[in-house]
Amino acid sequence: FMGDLKEQAENPEQKVQCGITEVDDCMVVGFKPGTLTLSVADVGGGKSTMMLNISFGLFKKGHNILFLPLEMSFEEIFKKFLCRETLIDFNRFANPAMLTDQDWECLKSHGEVIKKFQQKFLWADVKSRPTVAEIKRAIERKLKYFQPAVIVIDYIANIKPDAGSDNWLAIG
């Protein structure tokens, strides 16, 4: 044990952090490979927004992200990313006719980040209320050509249990 402890002290593991101080401070070891981290809140409690912000933060730190939205379209996710990145009011993305000339210039100036986003932040399309097996297959299809540091599934309540299994056990 002492030898392992000394080795860990001399060669500490790099934590995968998202850049949100409150989250990084709570996640003592960061997002470690092979771990399952659950974020919970009441309906309308901001889980999806929080997971998107964590994912965007991880992406901005150079990590590949695989996002499985079980209730939100990728178009909506991308609009939220653009809003966060450019600080343009989300209502103008929701109604693009409201985007100003200044907004369009801002979007152009963020072209490189947007291009990088499309290469390092992938999503996997899954049907509404997928089973654990269907989610696993969707992830495995992406793993053939993309190696994510973090996989985000938003959100767990929309997962249907495989026939004859308990949902909580299958998810774990």
Which residue stretches match the model-derived regions?
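Phosphate-binding loop that captures ATP/GTP phosphates
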Residues: 86-115
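P-loop NTPase motor core
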Residues: 3-76, 84, 123-172
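Conserved P-loop NTPase mechanochemical-coupling segment
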Residues: 107-130
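Metal-dependent catalytic core segments for phosphate chemistry
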Residues: 71, 77-80, 88-94
